[in-house]
């Protein structure tokens, strides 16, 4: 029986605790965290075939420079329902002087802007909007997942007590990555939350053997840092 809220088309309040069984897949290199996150999501959806995945990378001409829009195109390639939310529809020219983006900025600017321009025609769902923690919790409560771009220099895992064996950047203490003043982009997969303790559960592709957890305040700081464009790729279970 449908509730009045469902009948009215209103979203139901999420549960107090969600922890989705998203498999952990470790990145192989310093640059492929986004691809590792995509593999996790596709495996969670039951759609990961290694051969098909490699063929998709070739067809989409993905290189070592992976942007969130690339991951959205990858989801579209596999017929996965998605919604890419960002604050910038294209490349922010202000990033040209940031060390993280500087090396390949000119060539990447043209490529990435073209992907944004062609998104609608290619049926890649892109939207310029602000996403709240409540929006994310509602999404996760329905069994869906999300790939989020964060500043790894800010992200802090409350569960990690040992250094990262392999990651994009040098670890320090309990942090998934060392805290540096410069932006360091990194993708993670959201898999749940605990409203009572105010934490977010996620998979960090730097690890092969654990789920990570951080406070909502730290997660918000990491995902809204300058350089992320607040990019979040919502992926739907009913794909």
Swiss-Prot record:
Alphabetized PANTHER family for the sequence: GUANYLYL CYCLASE DOMAIN CONTAINING PROTEIN 1 GUCD1, PROTEIN GUCD1
The encoding gene: Gucd1
InterPro entries named in the record: GUCD1
Organism name: Mus musculus (Mouse)
Domain of life, per lineage: Eukaryota
Pfam family, one: Guanylate_cyc_2
Gene3D superfamilies: Cysteine proteinases
Protein name: Protein GUCD1
């Amino acid at each position: 029986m449908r509730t009045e809220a469902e009948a009215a088309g209103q979203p139901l309040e999420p549960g107090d605790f969600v922890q989705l069984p998203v498999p952990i897949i470790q990145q192989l290199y310093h640059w492929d965290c986004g691809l590792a996150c995509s593999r996790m999501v596709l495996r969670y959806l039951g759609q990961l075939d290694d051969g098909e995945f490699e063929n998709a990378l070739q067809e989409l001409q993905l290189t070592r420079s992976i942007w969130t829009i690339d991951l959205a195109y990858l989801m579209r390639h596999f017929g996965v329902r998605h919604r890419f939310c960002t604050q910038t529809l294209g490349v922010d020219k202000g990033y040209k002087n940031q060390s993280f983006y500087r090396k390949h900025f000119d060539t990447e600017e043209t490529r990435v802007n073209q992907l944004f321009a062609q998104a609608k025609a290619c049926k890649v769902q892109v939207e310029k909007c602000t996403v709240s923690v409540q929006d994310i919790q509602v999404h996760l409560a329905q069994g869906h997942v999300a790939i989020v771009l964060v500043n790894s220099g800010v992200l802090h895992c409350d569960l990690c007590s040992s250094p990262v064996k392999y990651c994009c950047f040098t670890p320090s203490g309990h942090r998934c990555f060392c805290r540096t003043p410069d932006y360091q982009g990194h993708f993670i997969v959201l898999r749940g939350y605990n409203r009572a303790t105010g934490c977010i559960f996620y998979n960090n592709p730097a690890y092969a053997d654990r789920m990570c957890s951080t406070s909502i305040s730290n997660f918000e700081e990491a995902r809204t840092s300058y350089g992320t464009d607040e990019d979040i790729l919502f992926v739907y279970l009913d794909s």
